[in-house]
């Protein structure tokens, strides 16, 4: 089975990986996808290893935005999904308040075991998604 799938500069893990050495180049992203990374020798990270949450959806008119998905969980715990926003209120006379944007999902978990970590330009990131924008007021 394949360890990774690739789309442009983004490599996505499909299972736990056991590597002798692993190098992530500049301007390259490894989406850990909630799986573990074991490196017997050196992990050289000049790109990004990440498992971010996803952004919440925007409110539309007086309808609530949806919550964003949490970071992926493969063999590790997934991030928590964000909750949906509230519906816009209604005032006598017909004015509707805008719906609230959904909350972003939390980042997932990253697990790395390596004898040596190297690289000066890379990073490891588990970041929550942004909240969605509120909807517009309706007359």
Predicted regions and their residues:
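Glycine-centric low-complexity/flexibility signal
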Residues: 1, 34, 40-139
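Extracellular beta-sheet-rich ligand-binding/adhesion modules
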Residues: 1-42, 109-114
